[in-house]
Amino acid sequence: AYTSMFGVMLGSFRNVTFEKPVLTVGSSSAGLLGAQCGSKDVPTEIKNVTVNDLVINMNGTAEGVGGLAGRAVNVKFSDITLSANIEDADKDGKVPDSVGGLVGVASEVPSMFTNVHTSGAITGNRRVAGMIGFIVENSENVVVEKSSSAMNVNAFGENTGGLIGYAEGEHLTVKDSHSTGTVENKGNYAGGLIGSMCGFSTISRCYATGDVLAKAGNHIG
């Protein structure tokens, strides 16, 4: 079973405010709106959504946990503000991979993120970030613009970033965006904006101001 409003959310979701929602996540992908939002065949729009003081308690090792969507496929996110505490409920380090303040995993048909802002704190294992945990190799041409994260990001493994944890898909575009939270992991590949990025991508008019620490000591930016 999925811990979300919808198992899979398709279509349009607009003009909604959430106050202090709480999710408990075990072994399945999860997000406040959907375990998965969008699909290859159904373009989906999430617009003008505010989430205040979301709490996600993770007590399992699901792949893909996000503030709004565990997984995003072919989604246009715009005009979104989200504050959240996404945490290790049992304090035992058994937490999911691919955890993002907004989206855990972006896959297949690329998604777009415009005027999206996240804040709070987030914990995960590998591929953890304030906005998108993991952009999968089969999801090229993802766009992030006019967006920011003020989330403090902490990971037990590698590939940790202020905005994006691991961008495996090529032709990523990030512009007019920034991160101000701290980024820390116990592995390698930690970045103020992006933990690790593959292929041909474009980063323009972006900055990060938070402290960055990778305790293994390699590939810090």
Q: In which residue ranges do the predicted regions lie?
A:
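Predominantly extracellular beta-rich ligand-binding scaffolds that present long acidic/polar faces
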Residues: 1-221
